Amino acid sequence: MKEYLDLCQLVLEKGHLKNDRTGTGTISYFGYQTRYDLQKGFPLLTTKKVHLHSIIHELLWFIRGETNIQSLVKNDVRIWNEWPYQKYCKSNYYQNETMEEFVEKIKNDDEFAKAYGDLGPVYGKQWRSFLGSDGKVVDQLQKVMEEINCNPNSRRLIVNAWHPAYIKEMALPPCHLLFQFYVNENRLSCLLYQRSADIFLGVPFNIASYALLTMMMAKVCNLEVGNFVHTIGDAHIYLNHIEQIKKQLSRTPRMLPKMIIHGNQQSIFDFKYEDFELQDYIPYPAIKGKVAV
């Protein structure tokens, strides 16, 4: 996707060297927006192979309101493993287990998973069970789906994952923290605000995930898809990802694939992994990079 490569090029050319929480170091650029027309194809990077399996399972995990990684690791999704493992390594119960041994325990031992696999009140918790100051719990995803159906012209079609009172309890505060739907001419668009964006590892997942969420919501609300608008605060390339980014910039983007959603779902909560079929995806080979924790 040219839009993604333009972001990469801009950050390399105009970004600033900046220290970060992980100690890795970044080239950072503040304030950027990209628009993807979902009528033109599914925005999954072709300049490297992206693991759609993980994207779909993670999105369904968010939608179910889950915060424990057990169901992810049972489906061979590894993207959240580092954070609970890092926390476990600092506990009194750590017995020099490797990451692989830790993940096997999470997968097969429900009590261990309950104790060490939870990420705190992260995305799914806030989407489905946002706790108000009055003690009332709000299912934001349910409410926004109902509002799209009942009042599509509303300017309040918002889901917010940023809960200041619980930030310290989260393994990682939400990076993609707020999204808003917009209906015009029977088409559903989505705007995401992302406070922090790891351009090499995170952004390709974020684009595809929210594009897919928009398609799913449009389907159950009997709408066509419009645009996915991606607004980023701190857009950064980690210093240990620069060569990987340059490799992508040397590759010519290919035609976007198509995403087919099978089934007759009536609610955003009805989707299953098997409902999704990606067609005509011809990416370049995958490029590896280490996640900064």
Task: Place the predicted regions along the sequence by residue.
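Terminal, non-catalytic protein-protein interaction segments that mediate quaternary/complex assembly
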Residues: 1-293
